[in-house]
């Protein structure tokens, strides 16, 4: 809007500038649930990184408009199921308190995060879908934070960021502004989230998922096939 950064440099500037705040929030939230199962956390992070590299070529050929409509429907349903869990309505059970996954649930988490990592290459964010995935698989809501933030941090630090820097497709001044301002914001957000009760945290996740679902719908209608 302010034209402070050349349009061509915006994607690289966003990726490079946000890498520092995202990495900081990942390490802060790694200790958010101290007893979170390392196998679950590492498996999901590795799956997202692998998806970014291996599935990117596949998902880049997907019809973006159809993907956005599908994600709108999926996220809306997931958010509704989570809301029912919070309110104790229907046959969906209660919000889980597990700190790790095993067996079929772990496989589902790995496969889902693999494709979420791939979808990052066409501009589909990983945060909200990963949050919903963790909650629906029965993990403690707090476990969603290290899982989703760790996945994005490693994707940006070892994936897109270095590529944009190598090609010089970023604005250094804007990146430093993002890095410093974002880092301060992350610290403030961490302490706010840390003070929330499980119920409040879960309701916040539900709200984020509903908002994200309608953003997918908006992008499907307005952007169509555009990135």
Positions of PLM-derived features:
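Small-residue-rich hydrophobic segments that form or flank transmembrane alpha-helices
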Residues: 1-56, 110-113, 117-190, 194, ...
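Short, aromatic-rich membrane-interface segments at the entry and exit
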Residues: 37-40, 68, 129, 199-204
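Short glycine/proline-centered loop/turn elements that form peptide/ligand docking sites
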Residues: 101-102, 128
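A helix-boundary/kink motif common to multi-pass secondary transporters
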Residues: 6-7, 63-67, 140, 197-201
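Transmembrane helix exit motif
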Residues: 53-65, 73-96, 211-227
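Juxtamembrane cytosolic amphipathic helices that cap and anchor the N-termini
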Residues: 104-109
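Membrane-interface helix termini and inter-helical loops of multi-pass transporters
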Residues: 30-38, 86-101, 190-200
């Amino acid at each position: 809007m302010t034209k402070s950064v050349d349009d061509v440099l915006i994607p690289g500037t966003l990726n490079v500038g946000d890498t520092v705040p995202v990495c900081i929030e990942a390490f802060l939230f790694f200790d958010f649930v101290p007893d979170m199962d390392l196998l679950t956390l590492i498996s999901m992070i590795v799956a997202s990184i692998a998806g970014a590299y291996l599935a990117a070529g596949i998902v880049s050929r997907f019809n973006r408009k159809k993907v956005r409509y599908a994600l709108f429907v999926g996220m809306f349903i997931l958010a509704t199921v989570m809301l029912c869990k919070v309110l104790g309505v229907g046959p969906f059970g209660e919000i889980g308190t597990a700190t790790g996954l095993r067996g079929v649930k772990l496989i589902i988490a790995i496969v889902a995060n693999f494709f979420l990592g791939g979808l990052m290459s066409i501009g589909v964010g990983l945060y909200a879908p990963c949050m919903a995935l963790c909650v629906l698989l029965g993990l403690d809501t707090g476990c969603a934070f290290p899982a989703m933030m760790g996945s994005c941090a490693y994707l940006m630090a070892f994936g897109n960021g270095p590529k944009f820097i190598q090609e010089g497709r970023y604005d250094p001044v804007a990146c430093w502004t993002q890095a410093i301002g974002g880092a301060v914001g992350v610290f403030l957000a961490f302490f706010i989230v840390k003070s929330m009760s499980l119920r409040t945290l879960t309701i916040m996740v539900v709200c984020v998922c509903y908002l994200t679902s309608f953003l997918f719908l908006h992008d499907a209608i307005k952007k169509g096939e555009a990135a």
